[in-house]
């Protein structure tokens, strides 16, 4: 019979039950955070160190310090968690990105304009200008410093394994361009993965091949004719563009009406 750390969640236990979560804190080592408070915030104890996991979104948080608030940290790292959203009394409409504001650098609103800034991009870096421009970045001309045309967020000191979209979402999770093109679920996933503690020596790197599916013609973006239509223009209501193309227009290409905002659509 295999041993199990006292207080660790039992196999098959329903951790969505508060009492079950509370029962995992038998050997909880953090004296300044009450187990009842942790359980009430959706977390159960994993039985190692001070690592906890949400029973609903699976985000894992560790390295708690005095002054930390489990509910606040839960909302910060996993804003789309269903448990967090229910506690906050969010409505389904909150899934839509905020009303579109003016881009910080409108001259770089198109991918082509951003790509042109990478003429002197350092050749030794793994990140290609094409993928950086696609992720919303333009090159500042200094070292490896890049900046988002929309949120004005800057990134530098790129590591070989840094993926532009993931880094953009991780450090600037409220960027309207990221939310419009990639969606809140992508941002949620990136933020969750960023705060999950992994043992680099024991956990293999898993690459999931990208799956490209042909999109029916009637679902294609009418601007680039390559990606799927995912954005609804407000107030006209036309659905004709993908996130990347929508970020670069201020009038609807169908009715030529002025746009108040562009909202990413979700399949339910």
From Swiss-Prot:
PROSITE patterns from the UniProt entry: BIR_REPEAT_1, BIR_REPEAT_2, ZF_RING_2
Molecular function as annotated in GO: cysteine-type endopeptidase inhibitor activity involved in apoptotic process; ubiquitin protein ligase activity; zinc ion binding
Catalytic activity: S-ubiquitinyl-[E2 ubiquitin-conjugating enzyme]-L-cysteine + [acceptor protein]-L-lysine = [E2 ubiquitin-conjugating enzyme]-L-cysteine + N(6)-ubiquitinyl-[acceptor protein]-L-lysine
Zinc finger (RING-type): 221-256
Binding positions (Zn(2+)): 148, 151, 168, 175
Enzyme class: transferase
Key word Transcription regulation present: no
Enzyme Commission code(s) on record: 2.3.2.27
UniProt-listed Pfam families: BIR (PF00653), zf-C3HC4_3 (PF13920)
Taxonomic superkingdom: Viruses
GO process terms (BP): negative regulation of apoptotic process; positive regulation of canonical Wnt signaling pathway; positive regulation of protein ubiquitination; regulation of cell cycle; symbiont-mediated perturbation of host ubiquitin-like protein modification
Known function: RING-finger E3 ubiquitin ligase required to prevent cellular apoptosis in infected cells. Ubiquitinates and subsequently targets host pro-apoptotic cellular proteins such as HID for degradation by the proteasome.
Protein name, per record: E3 ubiquitin-protein ligase IAP-3
Species of provenance: Orgyia pseudotsugata multicapsid polyhedrosis virus
Gene transcribed to yield this protein: IAP3
């Amino acid at each position: 019979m295999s041993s199990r750390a006292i207080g660790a969640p039992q196999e098959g236990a329903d951790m969505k039950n508060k009492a079950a979560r509370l029962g995992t804190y038998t050997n909880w080592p953090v004296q300044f955070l009450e187990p009842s408070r942790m359980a009430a915030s959706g977390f159960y104890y994993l039985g190692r160190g001070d690592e906890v996991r949400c029973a609903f979104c699976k985000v894992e948080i560790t390295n708690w310090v005095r002054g930390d608030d489990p509910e606040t940290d839960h909302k910060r790292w996993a804003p789309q968690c269903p448990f967090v959203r229910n506690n906050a009394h969010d409505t389904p409409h909150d899934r839509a990105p905020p009303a579109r504001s003016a881009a910080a650098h409108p001259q770089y609103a198109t991918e082509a304009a951003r790509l042109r800034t990478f003429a002197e991009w350092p050749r030794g870096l793994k990140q290609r200008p094409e993928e950086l421009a696609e992720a919303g970045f333009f090159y500042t001309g200094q070292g490896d410093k890049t900046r988002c045309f929309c949120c004005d967020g800057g990134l530098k000191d790129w590591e070989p394994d840094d993926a532009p979209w993931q880094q953009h979402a991780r450090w600037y999770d409220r960027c309207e361009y990221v939310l419009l093109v990639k969606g809140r679920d992508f941002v949620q996933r990136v933020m969750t993965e960023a705060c999950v503690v992994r043992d680099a020596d024991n956990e293999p790197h898993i690459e999931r091949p990208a799956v490209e599916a042909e999109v029916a013609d009637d679902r294609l973006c009418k601007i680039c004719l390559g990606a799927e239509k995912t954005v609804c223009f407000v107030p006209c209501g036309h659905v004709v563009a993908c996130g990347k193309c929508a970020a670069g227009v201020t009038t609807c290409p169908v009715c030529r009406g002025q746009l108040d905002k562009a909202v990413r659509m979700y399949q339910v």
